[in-house]
Amino acid sequence: MPPKRNFRKRSFEEEEEDNDVNKAAISEEEEKRRLALEEVKFLQKLRERKLGIPALSSTAQSSIGKVKPVEKTETEGEKEELVLQDTFAQETAVLIEDPNMVKYIEQELAKKRGRNIDDAEEVENELKRVEDELYKIPDHLKVKKRSSEESSTQWTTGIAEVQLPIEYKLKNIEETEAAKKLLQERRLMGRPKSEFSIPSSYSADYFQRGKDYAEKLRREHPELYKDRGGPQADGEAAKPSTSSSTNNNADSGKSRQAATDQIMLERFRKRERNRVMRR
């Protein structure tokens, strides 16, 4: 026969010890959970908003201000809603102070500080009277009420406008233009001469003045120009033709004598115009 195997059997005492260890571990975990829950509940209570001052009087507060106890059968969501409703219903902000209460506090403070309330009130009344005198308007500065007969607007109401003839309109226009011209002349007379006598183009003004001056001389002294014109005509008849060298010299002299200020001014204007267009 084959030999029998020996199996180790756990005794009853070992099983009881294991059970005790498991129970102790479970009880420790439950205790930790209970402590954590109690801590959370305590923090929630600290975060709860306290009830404020009721807006109603003390008699109405005694009847209405009592909060009904919440039944244990309600769910947690309904409990939170009831707490919020009661909080907002009873919490109010006191903005208006009771005048009697303020007066009583001032009187008590004055008694403690050793002041006489009647004397203080008399001084305040005197100061108020002085201030009222400062703000008082004298009689000559007050606005007087005018009647409808005294006001100027009442005289013009109801009067029909009359259309003036064209002669009056033309006369007004002429007088206006004459007044404008006179005003402009006065303004120019008040300014120094150098401000409005500067020409817009120096080169054009120079040549124009020279031309006007030459014409003026020809009109006033024609005998001078007659003497100059005769020899020139005789000389031209005597010398009908000249050499090419003399012509070239004359042309070069004429081109040198030609004024280039106007040409340079036109070039400058073109350059500035092109520069502005590029921008």
Swiss-Prot record:
Residues 68-79, 217-229 have a biased composition (Basic and acidic residues). Pfam families: Hep_59. InterPro entries: Tls1-like. GO terms for biological process: negative regulation of ubiquitin protein ligase activity; primary root development; regulation of photomorphogenesis; response to high fluence blue light stimulus by blue high-fluence system. Residues 86-183 form a coiled coil. Residues 1-29, 57-79, 217-279 are annotated as: Disordered. Keywords: Coiled coil, Nucleus. Disulfide bonds: none annotated. Residues 250-260 have a biased composition (Polar residues). It is found in: Nucleus; Nucleus speckle. Residues 270-279 have a biased composition (Basic residues). One of its GO terms (cellular component) is nuclear speck. Transmembrane segments: none annotated. Inhibits E3 ubiquitin-protein ligase activity of COP1, a central repressor of seedling photomorphogenesis. Represses COP1-mediated turnover of HY5 in the dark. Required for primary root development under normal light growth conditions. Interacts with COP1. Belongs to the TLS1 family. This is Protein COP1 SUPPRESSOR 2. The gene is CSU2.
